[in-house]
UniProtKB/Swiss-Prot annotation:
UniProt keyword annotation of Nucleus present: yes
SMART domains for the chain: RRM
This protein's name: Sex-lethal homolog
Region described as Disordered: spans on this chain: 285-307
Taxonomic source organism: Chrysomya rufifacies
Principal place of residence: nucleus
Primary gene name: SXL
Length: 307
């Protein structure tokens, strides 16, 4: 029922949900559970129910021409490297399950995989997911129909998932010294003015659930992340008492690894043994192995002993 995908970020669990052997319709209320207010295109759509109730939104959208590409304000836009079937869904409710996500998108068309990103140790949802459709037209229809839909007071953002590699390098920021009362909306207000935030995650105390003053903020573009660093690093934001530290998450990871190695007393790697040349003392560089030179070989290492 579950398949593990590859190429995961550190500490993150990505499960591919395979719906083929599961009957979802029996677990969800019918259309009466759907609370639909207004239409698409700026309207307000609230799906407080699950399953078929949420998923029926896609049936309200007209078919999309194969010549049109509606990114829905997504991350790729005209980037031809984007996968035409793989979507990223941001701002999911914290308690949303893979079954509910599948039911929401399934009526837009057949789905290959459907997965909510979670911490592999705690199961904590990072609030975003990937949905891979069988066809590009169904993926386009899902963006047009479900982008902006409100589910349990969360307004979903549905767009094309960006490819990995260089296109997303240096877009993830590590932020410290945030107020211990910071909320997602306040974090969005501080960083949102510098670009399109793809993902944000406030780290919380495992026991109390309160913010630890640390967060990760991922932007859509490298330039947006650099602008946020230039504008906010060593700056005291409104409501805070100390200046923020804002740097690339990759740099933070390298610094943390270096500090850990030093604590273990490992330090930097030792210098290589020099090659023979002027001033080379062979007796010094042969080391302790030189004392075993005259020992007789073990019988197992001398086949002639057994002949």
């Amino acid at each position: 029922m579950w398949r593990m995908s590859h190429s995961l970020p550190s500490g993150m669990s990505r499960y591919a949900f395979s719906p083929q052997d599961t009957d979802f319709t029996s677990s969800y209320p019918g259309p009466s559970a759907m609370n639909h207010r207004g239409g698409r295109g700026g309207g307000y759509n609230d799906f407080s129910g699950g399953g078929s109730a949420m998923g029926s939104m896609c049936n309200m959208a007209p078919a999309i021409s194969t010549n049109s590409v509606n990114s829905g304000g997504g991350d790729c836009g005209d980037n031809q490297g984007c996968n035409g079937t793989n979507l990223i869904v941001n701002y999911l409710p914290q308690d949303m399950t893979d079954r509910e996500l599948y039911a929401l998108f399934r009526t837009c068309g057949p789905i290959n995989t459907c997965r909510i990103m979670k911490d592999y140790k705690t199961g904590y949802s990072f609030g975003y997911a990937f949905v891979d459709f069988a066809s590009e037209i169904d993926a386009q229809n899902a963006i047009k129909s479900l982008n902006g839909v409100t589910v349990r007071n969360k307004r979903l953002k549905v767009s094309y998932a960006r490819p990995g590699g260089e296109s997303i390098k240096d877009t993830n920021l590590y932020v410290t010294n945030l107020p211990r009362t910071i909320t997602d909306d306040e974090l969005e207000k501080i960083f949102g003015k510098y670009g399109n935030i793809v993902q944000k995650n406030i780290l919380r105390d495992k026991l109390t659930g309160k913010p630890r003053g640390v967060a990760f903020v991922r932007f859509n573009k490298r330039e947006e992340a650099q602008e946020a660093i230039s504008a906010l690093n060593n700056v005291i934001p409104e409501g805070a008492s100390q200046p923020l530290t804002v740097r690339l998450a990759e740099e933070h990871g390298k610094m943390k690894a270096h500090h850990f190695m030093n604590q273990l007393g490992m330090g930097p790697p030792a210098a290589p043994i020099p090659a023979a040349g002027p001033g080379y003392n062979s007796m010094v560089h042969r080391g302790r192995h030189n004392k075993n030179r005259n020992q007789k070989p073990h019988p197992y290492h001398n086949p002639q002993k057994f002949i």
